């Protein structure tokens, strides 16, 4: 099974080697028939502490690193 890759924005970099990335998804509401925005936050591994708040990044699924971390930052988006 291929690893999932998501794009999002770094919202916190206060932890060592960890960033919190907010990933937004859009979908059509089944009853209201309008586009709805929902977001979810993922903790991702950042080995070199190079990503800062506001950066657009890609995260990739990986084996569990800690209790909450199952994603790693792959690259920055431009």
Curated annotation (Swiss-Prot):
Gene3D superfamilies: Nucleic acid-binding proteins. It holds the Pfam family Ribosomal_S17. The keyword Nuclease does not apply. Keywords: Ribonucleoprotein, Ribosomal protein, RNA-binding, rRNA-binding. PANTHER family: 40S RIBOSOMAL PROTEIN S11 FAMILY MEMBER, SMALL RIBOSOMAL SUBUNIT PROTEIN US17M. One of the primary rRNA binding proteins, it binds specifically to the 5'-end of 16S ribosomal RNA. Belongs to the universal ribosomal protein uS17 family. Part of the 30S ribosomal subunit. This is Small ribosomal subunit protein uS17. The gene is rpsQ.
């Amino acid at each position: 099974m291929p690893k999932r890759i998501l794009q999002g924005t770094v919202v916190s970099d206060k932890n060592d080697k960890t960033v919190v990335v907010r990933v937004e998804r859009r979908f059509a509401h089944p009853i209201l028939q309008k586009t709805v925005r929902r977001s979810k936050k993922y903790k991702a591994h950042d080995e070199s502490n190079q990503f800062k708040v506001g950066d657009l990044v890609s995260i990739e699924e990986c084996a569990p690193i800690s209790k909450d971390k199952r994603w790693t930052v792959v690259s920055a988006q431009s």
